Amino acid sequence: MSAISPDTKSFAIPTLADEGSSSKPASSLDLPKHESIRFKPIKTLASRIDGSEYYDEASMEKVMEMLEIGRTDEAVAYADTLYSNIIDDEQQDIVTIAEYVKILVVLRQWRRISHIIARGNYHQIHIVFAYYAATALFQRKLYEDVAELSVGHLLPSNGQIGPLPVRTLSQVTGRYVEEERMKYSFANMAELDNSSKKLRMVPALMITIAESFLKLMNRDAAMICINYALSLDNTTLHVERLMAKYNLVEPAMWEKYRKVRNEQLKLHEGNHDPRILMERAQRAYEMGRFRETKKITDELFDLFGPHPECIILRIHCLTMLKDSRSLLELGHQLVSDDPHIPLPWYCVAMYYYSIGANSRARNFISKCTMMDSTFAEGWVAFGHILHYEVEHEQSMSCYYRASKLVDKSSEPFLYTSLQYSTHSQKLSKKFMGEAVARAPNDPLIRHEEACVAYTAKSYAEADILFRTVLYMVTETDEIIPIEEVLKKKIDDFWHPMLNNIGHIARRQGRLNEAIMFYQKAIRMEPKFVDAIASTALCYAVLGNIDKATEFFNKALAIDPFNETIRQCLSKMIQASKESYSVDQQTLPPAYNSETYFGAQEILPYCAIRKPRNDGFVVPSIVSSSQPFMSMLRDRLRRQDQLYAQEPDNDAGNQV
């Protein structure tokens, strides 16, 4: 799953500070500068509660002062007073109106911004207003209105990109707009032009339109807008985040990018930049090192608070670790902060999913996807929840919806393949091939590919794939002996992978090697019943009955009702008894089986007992099965017959 939050305020507001000739991307909005001739201070007669009068002065300095101390309501009131002073001017200063809109952007008054710009059709007059109009509509989640904005005539032509999916004005409307532009002075229009170039508003506008197309699931139009924005400015930070969030990069290019970034991260050890920390956490998450991911996100949250772009990665990490308590606390914080976005409810759904309350998880994940139908992570989680409710068709529908939202992501194809693996190996391999083509170096995907091959009984192929995953996880070369690889530290998440390699080695007759993998998995997870029972089976085949019995006892102590383990133990006991020749043993004539075995308290269904704290002990081989007692009784019966015949023979000899 991706780590960038879908609910952050993901539009890029360019900075209004003086940037000069720097090519650094603008990612935040500074407080707007102003000239002394504009927004002159206004004194208004006001009264106190006691009835005394005083003059309240509204000025830009007062607005800045209120913003600095966080009193946004007073800042809005003073800004409105200043704007009201220029409304009745015969020749309005359009630059002053733009500065007022910038103040409203800082204050996040999106509805008022849309109204003021639409009132004078300013978005059709200049690119500055077009950008702010698109941003306001986007923040109000009016994505169709953003796509319908007629701003194509304001964009510079670029023959390399081709026609843009942006509306333009008709011929009649175009003449009307030109007449409106003539109402404003040339100096004002030139000042707005300089401001838009300095702030790079044209690429910022196209990125906002592109993200609106993505919300409308029109990825082709979005890519055209993004390519146009990159042709004008290829240093925009938001483009990188947008393409990573919606998986817009081709798999080969993305793998090259990740390889370069992984090398660069090695140069930033000890760096506390949140971007560096998030990339390190994402890298650890992809490699299955979830405890390391949690440690990095803990550091990030401690230094910078709950960073919005890291929240979804932390949710996924806590879910994989099954840290339900931390998920519950994080969900409460997110819901109390902003319950009107899907991310808090996604966290709540993951909490119920982690504790096994699938019905409640289904309710909250449904609410999450209804609030934002383009939330791909929500659809993937919805598919997981439906899978555990044994609704496979609906689960695959959710994965299909996610694949349409992020068609270059591997996860929807991976989980669809796993759904088909139970009844259609052909379709399973097809979708698994799609997932591998999109992320060939993802160890989780290669592990599931190996599992599909194992299910199809292609053990040689599965063995190669599992070992490839082992080398990926340990970050070692394939020429290193497997004994040295197993000495490296491996995250506990990968203990099923080691168990699977042991299964293949056991099936191919390499029993000692299989025991080595099982022992590594047991050290990572001491109560891993499958590995313990498999170790016992290997020892049984090797003829080490004592060791096999010991490990079978351990397995049944953890899971006493496991019928498979009980059957394996029973077959081992039967095989060991068949190899023991009873006829070669001499028993006393008056042998009484109850005398020798009654004191051991034989239980016919011993596995029904509840396990005690000191472990559950399986009865010994001699006293655990009824067929052996039958063999002893037959032997005693034959001995009695022989003793009965001996006196007759002695009498004949005497005669």
UniProtKB/Swiss-Prot annotation:
Effect of H332Y: In emb-27(g48); temperature sensitive mutant. Embryos arrest at the one-cell stage of embryogenesis
GO annotation, biological process: anaphase-promoting complex-dependent catabolic process; asymmetric cell division; cell division; eggshell formation; meiotic cell cycle; neurotransmitter transport; polarity specification of anterior/posterior axis; positive regulation of mitotic metaphase/anaphase transition
SMART domains named in the record: TPR
InterPro entries: TPR-like_helical_dom_sf, TPR_rpt
Disruption phenotype: RNAi-mediated knockdown results arrest at the one-cell stage of embryogenesis.
Summary of the tissues where the protein is detected: Expressed in GABA motor neurons.
Keyword Transit peptide recorded: no
Chain positions of TPR repeats: 44-77, 203-236, 342-375, 376-409, 495-528, 530-562
Keyword annotations: Cell cycle, Cell division, Cell junction, Developmental protein, Meiosis, Mitosis, Neurotransmitter transport, Repeat, Synapse, TPR repeat, Transport, Ubl conjugation pathway
Cellular location(s): Cell junction; Synapse
Pathway annotation from the record: Protein modification; protein ubiquitination
Keyword Protein biosynthesis: no
Region of interest (Disordered), ranges: 1-30
Gene3D superfamilies with a match to the protein in the record: Tetratricopeptide repeat domain (1.25.40.10)
CC annotations in GO: anaphase-promoting complex; anchoring junction; cytoplasm; synapse
Subunit organization: The APC/C complex is probably composed of at least 12 subunits: apc-2, apc-10, apc-11, cdc-26, emb-1, emb-27, emb-30, mat-1, mat-2, mat-3, such-1 and gfi-3.
Annotated function: Probable component of the anaphase promoting complex/cyclosome (APC/C), a cell cycle-regulated E3 ubiquitin ligase that controls progression through mitosis and the G1 phase of the cell cycle. The APC/C complex acts by mediating ubiquitination and subsequent degradation of target proteins. Developmental role in early embryogenesis and the metaphase to anaphase transition in oocyte and spermatocyte meiosis and mitosis in germ cells. Required for embryonic anterior-posterior axis formation.
Family: Belongs to the APC6/CDC16 family.
Protein name according to UniProt: Cell division cycle protein 16 homolog
Organism: Caenorhabditis elegans
